[in-house]
Amino acid sequence: MKYKFRNVVLGGTFDTLHSGHVKLLATATLIGDRILIGLTSDSFASTYKQYKVRPFSVRLANLRNLMSLIAPEREVAYVEIHDPYGPAVFDPRLEAIVASIETAPRALQINDERAKRGLRPMEVFIISTVRDGYGHTLSSTYIRRVLERPESKQS
């Protein structure tokens, strides 16, 4: 199958995997031949998360397992990122970036940084928000909060 882009990038913390992550990753596999996933380092995640995320090694293993289910035949590379941009600002091979509505401004910043470096901007694909049955936006933070509620811990 011929894909629209040879190299697609996306990034995130990928702490508690959920259907929003599946949508983000599946979108990347629908448009790109090779997928580069930037996974935040533990130290970088601690600068913006209000809770302690799972260790990098656990998040990476979970992400690899999920990608093997979504697109087992696809070439996927993983890179640990220590800032909001990762290799997206300097890798000239990258042609497209997939982002959520929440992270779309960061994708635009990345393209601005690429322009400053004389690189072509990437095409930006923004996925819509995924909501639970109550209309709440799904996120790892939201899921963690729900699971930590006292009523969630009752048998």
Curated annotation (Swiss-Prot):
Gene: coaD
Function statement: Reversibly transfers an adenylyl group from ATP to 4'-phosphopantetheine, yielding dephospho-CoA (dPCoA) and pyrophosphate.
Origin species: Pyrobaculum aerophilum (strain ATCC 51768 / DSM 7523 / JCM 9630 / CIP 104966 / NBRC 100827 / IM2)
Superkingdom of this protein's organism: Archaea
EC number of this enzyme: 2.7.7.3
Location (main, coarse): cytoplasm
The protein, known as: Phosphopantetheine adenylyltransferase
Gene Ontology molecular function terms on file: ATP binding; dephospho-CoA kinase activity; pantetheine-phosphate adenylyltransferase activity
Pathway(s) annotated for this protein in UniProt: Cofactor biosynthesis; coenzyme A biosynthesis
SUPFAM superfamilies: Nucleotidylyl transferase (SSF52374)
GO biological process: coenzyme A biosynthetic process
Enzyme category, top tier: transferase
Record keywords: ATP-binding, Coenzyme A biosynthesis, Cytoplasm, Nucleotide-binding, Nucleotidyltransferase, Transferase
Known catalytic reactions: (R)-4'-phosphopantetheine + ATP + H(+) = 3'-dephospho-CoA + diphosphate
PANTHER family: FAD SYNTHASE (PTHR43793:SF1)
